[in-house]
Amino acid sequence: MSYLSNRSASSSLAVLVECVVSPLLREHPAPICFELNVPLELTTTADRERLSDLIVSLVRGSLAQMPEGGELTVTGCLTAHGVELEIADTGSDVESRSTQLSLAAAAIGCKPQWQNCPQGGAAVTLVLPFSDAARKVA
């Protein structure tokens, strides 16, 4: 499912996340408190269609863990290794959910790192490599 076009241009990660997550939140039957902590100027050169598909998969997994509602937080920052994106929720812990996204993540050159959140729920962190590193993976 594609939410954005122009796959190769650098784009705002905040705008991409907002465009992908908003429809999923509207479809969810229970109330979800969504917090987006991604600077508007933070960009990525990752393939937007593939990244959108990966975010959709991760957010759907999070929402499935919160049938009665909860909190979903997406945080992004720039690191020495690339752009880091974390999706955290107040659903069940890591051991209670499917964490297999190797093909979707490998397509954009990242490996998801899963961890339990101290307040409950789980988080997955993606490091989107800089464009040179992404080209080597492809």
Feature-to-residue mapping (PLM):
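Short beta-to-alpha transition helix within the HATPase_c
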Residues: 9-26, 57
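Conserved catalytic submotifs in the C-terminal HATPase_c
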Residues: 33-42, 77-79
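A residue-level detector for a conserved hydrophobic packing site
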Residues: 51-52
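Conserved polar catalytic motif of the HATPase_c/GHKL fold
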Residues: 56-64
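Glycine-rich/acidic phosphate-handling loop/turn and adjacent ATP-lid/helix
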Residues: 82-103
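Glycine-rich ATP-binding loops of the HATPase_c
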Residues: 109-116
